[in-house]
Swiss-Prot record:
Region (Thiamine pyrophosphate binding): 442-523
InterPro entries assigned: DHS-like_NAD/FAD-binding_dom, Myo_inos_IolD, THcHDO_hydrolase_firmi, THDP-binding, Thiamin_PyroP_enz_cen_dom, Thiamin_PyroP_enz_TPP-bd_dom, TPP_enz, TPP_enzyme_TPP-bd
Highest taxon, organism lineage: Bacteria
Pfam families from the UniProt entry: TPP_enzyme_C (PF02775), TPP_enzyme_M (PF00205), TPP_enzyme_N (PF02776)
UniProt pathway annotation: Polyol metabolism; myo-inositol degradation into acetyl-CoA; acetyl-CoA from myo-inositol: step 3/7
Residues reported to bind thiamine diphosphate: 67
Organism annotation: Listeria monocytogenes serotype 4b (strain F2365)
Catalytic reaction annotation: 3D-3,5/4-trihydroxycyclohexane-1,2-dione + H2O = 5-deoxy-D-glucuronate + H(+)
Protein known as: 3D-(3,5/4)-trihydroxycyclohexane-1,2-dione hydrolase
Entry GO MF terms: 3D-(3,5/4)-trihydroxycyclohexane-1,2-dione hydrolase activity; acetolactate synthase activity; flavin adenine dinucleotide binding; magnesium ion binding; thiamine pyrophosphate binding
GO CC annotations, alphabetized: acetolactate synthase complex
Length: 638
């Protein structure tokens, strides 16, 4: 190291360092940090704000409208870029920083890299307690930002300018490591942001972070091949790791070579297009009938880049007790799940090495894969044409709302539109390369089952944290990451819209057109289904006023007030017309659809373990508890 230095404030050094971070994947190099979202307040406006104003470099700066909302946009950007490009997020101290914590949980649960820069209290403590500072009798060192420790892959505090160097180097190692990718949080004391230091110039050299494709050992590959050859009906679960590895070609080649069917997690969906003959779609609690039948048949499950969440495993009841597992993952920790044979490696590289070892091998599925897929497509076609009537209508979610209640909803919402018909209509009428973004409620289930991606990397579901309010804000991030003319559709329920839609305004502010598909069934329909399916009555999940009337909300008018182009569509014909006109618009659009409750799709061959009350005065809850205990007898314990 030379003795040459450059005098900068801590914040200026931060911005200069971010400009010098690059990532190289398969010989292609690009900047790793494309920009920064910020909401200025005391704690960052005169520190990081000054540094960005004076010398932003190539960093694009976006003004967020809510800290959680802008952070979800940053998370979606990283997800859509397959974890190879990021945005940072800077906030003020106190509540501004606290608003990031939920989003940090979203990033951590989904293994997505984001750099969080929450401002902190004074390092000198001279003016304490400052505005928005918490006071604890037990410790002066505790601040709001301690809440980040549970939701960060890497957490650090900078209270002296020279601490920035080691903090940033460690943070970027974590964010650019496929095995540990996740949010890095660096809390910078607000007085330290403006404090100057003579930094060594070498700290600001161009740094290239290489995403090397880890190849498993010969032992791992040989044993994995032996286990596959010994199986008769293996199934591959395509997880998010397969998508981030860009393993599409290798998955197709191996499946064609061996006739192994493919099923998908939310994170893995659209790694390859649905039209591939052996792709049976989503698996688990929200899976297709075809995928869940294949998993039920499996004597070997090959999990590629999956965390095996309860929604993938149906709370560990989806598999036969004798089923064996091979787990291929860059994270050694993930490979240990379900007592699997562990293969630590990159999905794309591992599949390329494995294929030659399986030469001549064929599963015994035969024509069963095609039969399962045909049966499922027939079921999807039925769901596309469900029609309401006022006398004998049976919704997909049966035995919860009677005809009178459904008629009440039809009258109050002035609609007979079913949710499944509306969703499939959207799928059939948007451009094939359109990106669909969703996160929470009943819509992820419909998307996992019914949305058929025609182009890879166009299905964008945040289902690690399933955070309400991600949809619209995440759509902005996906749009920022998308090709110039690629349309992005936020699929959102009225519940999630109410939770957060702050970056709708940001999309209009910066000309980043998104299309918001708002499904209004006047309530938290997904959770209403859950409570009633487990013996409870409908209780505080419907949007009813103090007179027990179903609420009537004009969500389109809210978006219109922001400046969006809006439509109201309560029939298939009106929806198609709105979709076509929305394609011609240059600014953000919102299509409001009033849909009937209980008309979302129901599960197939699945079960979800939830905390049903063991003691109750209601017979229906007692029965639900007994059913839970019976299902647990078929579940793996770990």
């Amino acid at each position: 190291m030379t003795e040459k230095t450059i005098r900068l404030t801590t914040a200026q050094a931060l911005v200069k360092f971010l400009n010098q971070q690059y990532i190289e994947v398969d010989g292609e190099m690009a900047p790793f940090v494309d920009g920064i979202f910020t909401l200025f307040g005391h704690g960052n406006v005169v520190g990081i704000g000054q540094a960005l104003e004076e010398a932003p470099g190539h960093l694009k700066v976006y003004q967020g409208k809510n800290e959680q909302g802008m952070a979800h946009a940053a998370i979606a950007y990283a997800k859509q870029k397959n974890r190879q490009r990021i945005y940072a997020c800077s906030t003020s101290a106190g509540p501004g920083s606290a608003n990031l914590i939920t989003a940090a949980g979203t990033a951590l649960a989904n293994n997505l890299p984001v750099l969080f820069l929450p401002a902190d209290t004074f390092a000198t403590r001279q003016p304490d307690p400052v505005l928005q500072q918490l006071e604890h009798e037990s410790s002066t060192a505790i601040t709001t930002n301690d809440g980040f420790q549970a939701v960060s892959r890497y957490f650090d505090r900078v209270q002296r300018p020279e601490q920035l160097m080691s903090a940033l180097i460690r943070a970027f190692e974590v964010m650019t490591n496929p095995a540990s990718a996740g949010p890095a949080t660096i809390c910078i004391a607000q007085d330290t942001e403006g404090e100057a230091f003579d930094y060594p110039v070498e700290f600001f050299q161009k740094r290239i972070h290489y995403l090397n494709r880890q190849i498993p050992t010969k032992r791992e590959l040989t044993e994995a091949a032996r286990l596959i050859k010994a199986s008769k009906t293996p199934v591959i679960i395509v997880g998010g790791g397969a998508r981030y590895s860009r393993a599409r070609e290798e998955l197709i080649a191996l499946s064609e070579q061996t006739n192994i069917p493919l099923v998908e997690t939310h994170a893995g969906k659209s790694t390859l297009e649905f039209d591939f003959k052996n792709n049976l779609g989503g698996t688990g609690i929200l899976g297709t009938l075809a995928a869940n039948k294949a998993i039920r048949d499996a004597d070997l499950v090959i999990g590629i880049g999956t965390r095996y969440t309860d929604f993938t495993t149906s709370s560990k009841t989806a598999f036969d007790p004798t089923t064996k597992f091979i787990n291929i993952n860059v994270s050694r920790m993930q490979t240990y799940k379900l007592d699997a044979f562990q293969v630590v490696g990159d999905a794309k590289a591992t599949l390329a090495e494995l294929a030659p070892l399986l030469k001549g091998y064929q599963t015994q599925f035969g024509n069963k894969i095609a039969a399962y897929k045909t049966e499922w497509l027939d079921e999807r076609a039925r769901l596309q044409t469900t029609k309401f009537n006022r006398e004998t209508f049976t919704p997909e979610i049966k035995d919860q709302f009677d005809q009178a209640i459904l008629n009440e909803y039809a009258d109050r919402l002035q609609t007979e539109f079913t949710q499944t018909e509306a969703l499939i209509t959207i799928n059939d009428n948007v451009a094939p390369d359109s990106i669909v973004v969703c996160s929470a409620g009943s819509l992820p289930g419909d998307l996992q089952r019914l949305w058929n991606p025609a182009v890879p990397d166009t299905y964008h579901l945040e289902y690690g944290y399933s955070c309400m309010g991600y949809e619209i804000n995440g759509a902005l991030g996906a749009k920022m990451a998308a090709a110039k003319k690629q349309e992005v559709y936020a699929i959102v329920g009225d519940g999630s819209f109410c939770m957060s839609h702050s970056e709708l305004l940001t999309s209009l502010q910066y000309g980043k057109k998104i299309n918001i598909m708002l499904f209004d069934n006047s309530g938290f329909g997904c959770i209403n289904n859950l409570q009633m399916a487990n013996g409870s009555d409908s209780f505080f999940c419907e949007f009813r006023d103090s007179d027990n009337q179903i609420m009537q909300v004009d969500y389109a008018k809210i978006a219109e007030g922001y400046g969006a182009k809006v439509y109201r569509a309560n029939t298939k014909e009106d929806l198609i017309s709105a979709l076509e006109d929305a394609k011609t618009q240059s600014k953000t659009t919102l299509i409001e659809m009033k849909v009937l409750p209980k008309t979302m799709s129901e599960g197939y061959l699945n079960w979800w373990n939830v905390g049903v009350s063991e003691v109750s005065n209601k017979e229906s809850i007692k029965q639900a508890y007994e059913e839970k205990q019976a299902n647990l007898k078929n579940a793996r314990l770990y």
